[in-house]
Regions:
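Extracytoplasmic/periplasmic substrate-recognition and gating elements
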Residues: 99, 110-112, 128-183
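C-terminal structured domain segments
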Residues: 12, 183-184
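Ligand-binding pocket segment of bilobal, Venus flytrap-like solute-binding proteins
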Residues: 17, 22-137
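Short helix-loop capping/hinge motifs at secondary-structure junctions, enriched
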Residues: 2, 35-44, 162-168
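Short, flexible loop/turn elements at secondary-structure junctions
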Residues: 1, 19-21, 118-119, 141-142, ...
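A conserved helix-loop-strand patch within extracytoplasmic ligand-binding domains
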Residues: 1-17
């Protein structure tokens, strides 16, 4: 059961993840965790763990304290760096989010986990052994502690040489502000 974000970096866990050198988005996620807001979430999630699980992670957290200070991170930066170190040292590198999704939706993928773009589940073709219902999004479960994903802001621009700027603005509004446009 993954009810805390530290479970994903626990002993023997090898989450499926698109290798950090495949696309910058994976690195951005890890960098983002060092922001005070997310580092505090990691600390709070750590504090919610049972004592035996805390004891497993504590040496890595302690090891990262001087590194966090050297990098000028906030008071909880050592929790972020520890989580990142454990994640990078344990994930099962994949080439893309598509194969990760295809693995996790099979009924044989019990006790596997991964971090991937959520919209990959939209393209799953349901069958006897394949279903999005085989996946539980940890962050959506009652009682989950810690980080649970992230999203990027959409930046859609209209250039100053656009022949139809109001049409472009209307299209952007449709894509970002309506259910039909967003799901397209």
């Amino acid at each position: 059961v993954y009810d805390n974000c530290w479970d994903f970096v626990g002993e023997g866990v090898h989450a499926l993840f698109m290798d950090i050198d495949s696309e910058v988005v994976g690195k951005n996620f890890l960098y983002m965790l060092t922001e005070d807001k997310y580092a505090a979430m990691l600390k709070d999630a750590f504090n919610a763990l049972p004592a035996d699980e805390q004891a497993y992670f504590q040496p890595t957290i302690d090891e990262m304290e001087s590194e966090a200070s050297d990098l000028g991170l906030g008071a909880d930066g050592k929790y972020a760096l520890a989580w990142i170190k454990l994640w990078v040292g344990s994930y099962n590198a994949q080439t893309d989010d598509g194969p990760i999704c295809n693995t996790l939706v099979t009924d044989s993928a019990t006790d596997q986990c991964g971090l991937l773009v959520y919209n990959k589940f939209r393209s799953v073709e349901e069958s006897a052994g394949v279903s999005v219902n085989n996946v539980k999004v940890a962050a959506y479960q009652d009682g989950y502690q810690g980080i649970g994903g992230y999203g990027y802001c959409h930046y859609l621009f209209v250039t100053d040489n656009s022949p139809l700027p109001w049409t472009a603005c209307a299209f952007i509004a449709y894509m970002t502000c309506t259910e039909d446009g967003y799901s397209a």
